[in-house]
Each structure stands twice: as structure tokens, then as C-alpha cells.
């Protein structure tokens, strides 16, 4: 299994210089990226395409805010055409759904398969990336995640191990529930730290937390997941990516024995 990087992890360096921010990843042997936290314009697309042409690294997906996925289809598609990327990921549930009425949520759910078809006609697969808001229960007792799955048929999903585990759900169980609708996985570990009188969850280097990543990778292979990317909110991104990558490679090598 190949392990890429979600560029939210290196967002500060990427904002300063895309090319220089990718070089340490290339040196680590990273060959796949899910690109996030940049302007999806032609200038950046041209730069990423040039990097891909000179190095063994490519975008497997781009994570885009809902307002652009729905409101600027031509711009998003153009970015994908230039970079050779075939997957677009809706970054999150719109704030109108998180804070608004259930009617707004169900309206968004109803729009997903329709938007999937629009991108599919352009040769692009559309997926949805979740956080922990999707595990909140609605007035009918079902979670938003359950409704997202049951009321759509085409939209793919990108799973986030951290947000699932933080919500008290087993990541490998959620992966199997997604089944063949799982497109990719954000690999993030979960740890806890004391803050005053509270115990606060946070993401951490893979292997330093509580998530069973062997179970995650086994489930990912079982359902035919297309890509996996390391993601973490950290002040030392390259060091932490390297440590996470080493841990995942050890798990991967043991699985082949």
C-alpha cells in the first residue's frame, strides 16, 4: 500500500513556496498528494504539473471547499485537467448544515449525487470528507453519517481516522461500512493531553496514539481503498510525516510476512 500526504499538514510551507514545500516529501519517497489549502487557480495548477513532470510525485486528489465544488465547477475541473488529477473531495459539511436546520442538511445530502454526476461527466470522481459533526444524532435518532450513506448512492467518501475515533467509532468498522464507496483515507492518530482540569483530544504522529492502524490498513485493503494520505496538525510537519511514514511502513511490511 502506498502512503501519501495531505498537504494541510504542510500548509504553511506550501503557502510560501509550493515547489520547496514538496521537496522534503519527494526526498522521503512520497509520490502521492491530496492537495488542500491552496488557491485552485491555473498558476498553481501549472506549478504542480511542472513539479509532477520533473519528480515522482502527483496529486491523487484535491480537497476543495463546498462553495467552490458547487459554485465553480469549471474552475475546479480546469485545475484537475492541468494537474492530471481525477478526484475532487468536498472538504467539509457546509456551516449552514452544521449550525442550521435539519432541512438544510437534508437539502445538502440531496445535492450530493447530482453534483457527483456533473463531475463524473467531466471524468472526475467526487467524494465527501467528514469530520466529527457527522456523528451527531438528528431528531430521528440517526447520525448525519448514517443519513449521508443511506440517502446517497453515488457520492464517494474520504474517511478520517482521527475524527471517527474521536467520536467513539472504530475507524476500521467505519471503513467497512463505507465499503466500495470509500475513495481514500486520511491517516491521523488520536491522543489525549491534560489541559487544566480537562482531558483534551488531539491528533498526533501515527503510532503515538490509540488507533489500531493495522486494523485500519487491513480494512482499507479489504474494501479496495484507492489512496491513503498522512495528515496532522503539527508545528513540525516534516519530522512528524517521516515518523508516521516509518510506522506505517513497518505495519505494511509485517502484513506481507
Question: Where is each model-derived feature located?
Answer:
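Boundary/entry segment of secreted carbohydrate-active catalytic domains
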Residues: 1-16
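Glycine-rich, proline-tolerant flexible connector loops at the mouths of alpha/beta enzymes
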Residues: 33-53
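Active-site beta-loop-alpha junctions enriched in small/polar residues
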Residues: 6-10, 36-38, 64-67, 93-95, ...
Amino acid at each position: 500500500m502506498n502512503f501519501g500526504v495531505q498537504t494541510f499538514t504542510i500548509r504553511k510551507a506550501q503557502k510560501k513556496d509550493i515547489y520547496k514545500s514538496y521537496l522534503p516529501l519527494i526526498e522521503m519517497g512520497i509520490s502521492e498528494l491530496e492537495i488542500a489549502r491552496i488557491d485552485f487557480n491555473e498558476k498553481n495548477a501549472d506549478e504542480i504539473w511542472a513539479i509532477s513532470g520533473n519528480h515522482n510525485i502527483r496529486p491523487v486528489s484535491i480537497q476543495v471547499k463546498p462553495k467552490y465544488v458547487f459554485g465553480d465547477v469549471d474552475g475546479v475541473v480546469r485545475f484537475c485537467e492541468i494537474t492530471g488529477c481525477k478526484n475532487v473531495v468536498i472538504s467539509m459539511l457546509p456551516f449552514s448544515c452544521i449550525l442550521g436546520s435539519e432541512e438544510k442538511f437534508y437539502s445538502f445530502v440531496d445535492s450530493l449525487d447530482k453534483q457527483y454526476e456533473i463531475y463524473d461527466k467531466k471524468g472526475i470522481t467526487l467524494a465527501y470528507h467528514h469530520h466529527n459533526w457527522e456523528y451527531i444524532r438528528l431528531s430521528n435518532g440517526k447520525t448525519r453519517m448514517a443519513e449521508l450513506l443511506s440517502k446517497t448512492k453515488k457520492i464517494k467518501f474520504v474517511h478520517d481516522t482521527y475524527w471517527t475515533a474521536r467520536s467513539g467509532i472504530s475507524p476500521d468498522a467505519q471503513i467497512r461500512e463505507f465499503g466500495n464507496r470509500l475513495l481514500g483515507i486520511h491517516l491521523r492518530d488520536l491522543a489525549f493531553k491534560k489541559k487544566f482540569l480537562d482531558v483534551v483530544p488531539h491528533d498526533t504522529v501515527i503510532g503515538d496514539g490509540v488507533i489500531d492502524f493495522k486494523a485500519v490498513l487491513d480494512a482499507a485493503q479489504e474494501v479496495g481503498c484507492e489512496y491513503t494520505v498522512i495528515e496532522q496538525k503539527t508545528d513540525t510537519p516534516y519530522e512528524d510525516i517521516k515518523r508516521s511514514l516509518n510506522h506505517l511502513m513497518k505495519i505494511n511490511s509485517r502484513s506481507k510476512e
